[in-house]
Curated annotation (Swiss-Prot):
This is Ribonuclease P protein component. It comes from Chlamydia trachomatis serovar A (strain ATCC VR-571B / DSM 19440 / HAR-13). The lineage of its organism: Bacteria, Pseudomonadati, Chlamydiota, Chlamydiia, Chlamydiales. Gene3D superfamilies: 3.30.230.10. The gene is rnpA. The keyword Nuclease applies. RNaseP catalyzes the removal of the 5'-leader sequence from pre-tRNA to produce the mature 5'-terminus. It can also cleave other RNA substrates such as 4.5S RNA. The protein component plays an auxiliary but essential role in vivo by binding to the 5'-leader sequence and broadening the substrate specificity of the ribozyme. One of its GO terms (cellular component) is ribonuclease P complex.
Amino acid sequence: MSRLTLPKNARLLKRKQFVYVQRNGRCCRADQVTLRVVPSRHSNTRKVGITVSKKFGKAHQRNRFKRIVREAFRHVRPNLPGCQAVISPRGNSQPDFLKLSEELLQRIPEALPLASSSRC
């Protein structure tokens, strides 16, 4: 039986990985989240990092946001091109899972061909 979690090799874990995507990635705003996307060095690698500031809310709210985003990314990951993405919330509301999945599936490929512009 397979584990229904986002594997560790599908996550950005180190600070330098986040900094690389923040500096070199293209910013794309969706209704619920802000994305920074950079093409992956390896065509099949799809990784996600999630950042949530303390302004978003208490720890349980930040953790819930991260769980929802991880699960949405896990569901759409097979349909995405090779990329590394950093996802941050817009506003203080919890995202809707289905809407977030659709936004990720639509916005990440849109951001990839033009990854040279980093303005948000």
